[in-house]
Amino acid sequence: MSEDLAKQLASYKAQLQQVEAALSGNGENEDLLKLKKDLQEVIELTKDLLSTQPSETLASSDSFASTQPTHSWKVGDKCMAVWSEDGQCYEAEIEEIDEENGTAAITFAVYGNAEVTPLLNLKPVEEGRKAKEDSGNKPMSKKEMIAQQREYKKKKALKKAQRIKELEQEREDQKVKWQQFNNRAYSKNKKGQVKRSIFASPESVTGKVGVGTCGIADKPMTQYQDTSKYNVRHLMPQ
């Protein structure tokens, strides 16, 4: 996934350079200015996602390697688990166990919410109830804090990925607007100074996308990439 994001980042940067080149000759074009702003935002979001992935993976592996579960769990067991929404402990049932990653899919008895949580965070029902009664408002343990922090980072990354998806859609809308503007300008201009959208898709699989009228020579065009396959789940940290 990091490799995919890196490729996307390179593509966004190349597109930004082309838009900036187009703006050098048409600096007041609102569509180009909006596209430049969107590209700058999506570049920053993609950088954030790339920077958070290695640290989360490392934190996950370190915490799992240093703390193995002391209880032998099996599917169908009742347990006490921390709900990520409020950090409180509730009774749950184990639906599935992933021994390789040290996690369990559980369903909370009260609300019926399903969640995946580290096995090391699960406690036997009686032990968990007693700990909950004794602790009162006692701060969460280090293990619980790590689990909660990981969940928070995943949710934050999901929001960033969703924003990238929204920006991709906005760019498609901007492409349509540019094409409409292009057609109107060409119909009024007999000399045909504006003939083709800088956002136009290639006419063949070997075609390229780029600014042909930017006045920059000897610079390669950006390879056309279909970004529709990159959805939110592709961008989420593992």
Swiss-Prot record:
Residues in Tudor domain copies: 72-132
A UniProt-annotated Pfam family: SMN_Tudor
GO molecular function: RNA binding
Annotated compartments: Nucleus speckle; Nucleus, Cajal body
Known role: Involved in spliceosome assembly.
PANTHER family tied to this protein: SURVIVAL OF MOTOR NEURON-RELATED-SPLICING FACTOR 30, SURVIVAL OF MOTOR NEURON-RELATED-SPLICING FACTOR 30-RELATED
Quaternary structure, from the entry: Associates with spliceosomes. Associates with U4/U5/U6 tri-snRNP and with U2 snRNP.
Designated name of the protein: Survival of motor neuron-related-splicing factor 30
Species: Mus musculus
Gene this chain is encoded by: Smndc1
